[in-house]
Amino acid sequence: MHCLWDLPEVMMQANAWPLSSSLGREWHVPGPATQDGLITGLYDEAISRTSCNLVMQALIFMKKYPVQGGPEVMEMPRFWHPNFNWYGPAGIGSARGIKGFRDWHQIPFIAAMPDRGLYPKETSAHFFAEGPYVAVTGWPNMAQTISQAGWLGIAPGNTKITLRSLDFWRVEAGKIRENWVLVDLLHVYDQIGVDALARMREFNKSRTGFDPDTGQAL
C-alpha cells in the first residue's frame, strides 16, 4: 500500500498556503462515487482493456486542441459524461462537467502553455487498468513552456517546465465519469524559482501553533 501526500492541501488545511488561490473548488476530494475502488474479484481483461482504450482515445483527441482547431476537435461529449467530476490537486481545485473543467482548468492551463503535448520524446506515460478504473503515470509525463499568462498567477517567463503526475479515471456506461489528477505542484513552482516551502515558513513565522479544540492553525 502506497500513500500520496498532497502537501499543498496540508498547507491549506493549516491556513498556511503561500501562493495563488485555486480557480477550482478546494475541498476534501472523495473516492469513487460508486465506492468500489478496491477490487477484490478476478481481473477482467476485456473490461479493463476497453476502459483503458477509451481513456487513451480521449487523451489523443484532447491533445488535438489547440494545434488542430477549436474545442470541438477534442470531441469531449464522445468520451466524457456531461457531468463528469474532475478532481484536481490542491492549488488547482476541482470542477464538474465539461464546461466546469474547461473554465476552471483547461482554458487557463492551455492559454498559458499552448505548446502542451509537443514534446513527446521528453516525457513518458505508463497506462494500466482494472475493470472500470484506468491510471497513468509519468515522471515526467508532460512538458511545455509558460509563454502566456493565466495559470496559477505565474508570470509568462518563457520557462519550459515538466509536470510529474499520477492520474486516475473511472469509466461508467462507456463514458469517463470521474477523473482524479495528482500533479506535483511544488515541483512546478521549484522549476520557476519559487520555493513554496520557504515562502510558507516566511509567511507564517509569527504564528504560535494550533487551537487544541478546532485543530486550526493560529
Kindly label every feature range from the protein language model:
Residues 1-218:
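C-terminal and inter-domain tail/linker signature
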